[in-house]
Regions:
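Extended alpha-helical targeting/anchoring segments
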Residues: 1-200
Length: 200
């Protein structure tokens, strides 16, 4: 089960779009919008991911432009409302992009929002410390109708193995206890399930 997927890339009329999302807060927090928009850590992380995605897109497209920067969205989840900040980045693909679609997607993987920056170094560290394969977690899925493409990243992922439910969700480098608290918080939005969850 995948929930709250994040857009990977969208291709429409020969243009490629990406919407990096960094920065989320519970809408019920007092002055939530202001806290999210002025938080130095959130601003820095957002700037970093926008720069990374611009760089990634420049490898497979031209005329890269950030058309919207750190805009605020209000999202209704199953149990509450949240605010998050995103940006919109656009590039122009070559006229024959359809014949190069596999190379375009592979050239953008892994998603910048998953690995962060610097990309090559971070991916190397992840490969060294992770204990096993991720499977579908943090991969992408989508559809291509012959003209346009929509795709998304599996950023929160629930997998059933036998009688066990394995929940996968990531986060940036932080203090381990705060990361674990955050991971536990996100499980509140999981479907009701009477068995044990394993947070991985």
């Amino acid at each position: 089960v995948i929930y709250s997927p994040e857009c990977f890339v969208k291709i429409k009329d020969g243009q490629i779009y990406s919407y990096p999302m960094k920065g989320t807060i519970d809408a019920q927090v007092p002055e939530a919008k202001k806290k999210l928009q002025t938080n130095p850590k959130e601003i820095n992380e957002h700037n970093t991911i926008v720069d990374l995605i611009r760089n990634d897109l420049s490898k497979i497209a031209r005329e890269i432009a950030v058309t919207r920067f750190r805009y605020l969205d209000k999202i209704q989840t199953q149990k509450k409302e949240i605010y998050h900040t995103s940006s919109e980045i656009i590039g122009k693909l070559s006229p024959d992009w359809k014949t190069q679609l596999p190379e375009i997607l592979l050239g953008l993987l892994p998603a910048g929002s998953i690995c962060g920056a610097p990309k090559a170094k971070t991916v190397s560290i992840i490969k060294n410390v992770e204990e096993g394969p991720r499977g579908y977690y943090t991969g992408i899925f989508g559809y291509f109708d012959g003209e346009n493409l929509e795709s998304a990243v599996n950023i929160r992922y629930l997998e059933k193995k036998g009688e066990q439910m394995i929940y996968r969700s990531g986060g940036g480098i932080s203090r381990p206890n705060l990361y674990f608290q955050g991971a536990n918080l996100t499980t509140k939005y999981l479907p009701d399930y009477s068995g044990p969850y394993h947070i991985g």
